[in-house]
């Protein structure tokens, strides 16, 4: 993997770009909702108010659109808040995207009609139809990651070799991962 699209310009999505860029990946970040983050990420300084720091100059910001989703990426990283999961799932399906996903979003989704609880990856798979979905979980705070404090995460996928492939592209001395 080399070209990543990160959807979600909040604290975790933006912090996650740092180890990705350090591993020489081509990283594009986009933000579908927050005008504040859109303004910050598209500026020359790339100052992120939630992280209270400038993001790397190599980070590319692109305006969110269906056309952006259709571009060739090796991995799409979902870093939206829980309410954005349905939106992005529908967008991925509408644009016929089948790129592997890595989900950073934490939490569970309760569907009141069926009275069922879904993990975020289950919900995304159901809405988007994408089968290759990995999740990244762990005791990792965005500010710690952005400041390169040692932290660790677990990457899970039904195909452990694919999870390991992601791990190789994001692991650093301070950002450790297991599978």
Per-region residue spans from a language model:
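A structural micro-motif
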Residues: 2, 25, 59, 99, ...
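Conserved anion/nucleotide-ligand pocket segment
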Residues: 148-178
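Rossmann-like NAD(P)(H) cofactor-binding subdomain of soluble oxidoreductases
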Residues: 55, 62-66, 71-149, 163-167
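Hydrophobic beta-strand segments of well-ordered beta-sheets in folded domains
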Residues: 4, 27, 100-102, 151-153
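Conserved residues at beta->alpha junctions
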Residues: 31-32, 79-80, 157
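NAD(P)+-binding Rossmann beta1-loop-alpha1 motif at the extreme N-terminus of oxidoreductases
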Residues: 1-54, 59-63, 70, 111, ...
């Amino acid at each position: 993997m080399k070209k990543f699209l990160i959807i979600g310009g909040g604290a975790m999505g933006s912090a996650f770009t740092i180890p990705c860029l350090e591993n020489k990946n081509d990283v594009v970040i986009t933000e579908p909702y927050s005008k504040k983050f859109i303004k910050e990420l598209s500026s020359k300084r790339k100052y992120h108010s939630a992280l209270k720091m400038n993001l790397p100059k190599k980070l590319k910001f692109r305006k969110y659109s269906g056309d952006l989703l259709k571009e060739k990426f090796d991995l799409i990283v979902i870093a939206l808040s829980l309410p954005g999961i349905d939106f992005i799932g529908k967008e991925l399906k509408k644009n016929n995207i089948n790129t592997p996903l890595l989900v950073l979003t934490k939490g569970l989704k309760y569907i009141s009609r069926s009275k069922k609880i879904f993990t975020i990856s289950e919900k995304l798979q159901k809405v988007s139809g994408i089968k290759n979905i990995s999740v990244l979980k762990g005791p990792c705070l965005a500010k710690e990651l952005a400041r390169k404090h040692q932290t660790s995460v677990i990457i899970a996928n039904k195909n452990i070799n694919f999870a390991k492939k992601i791990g190789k592209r994001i692991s650093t001395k301070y950002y450790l991962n297991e599978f």
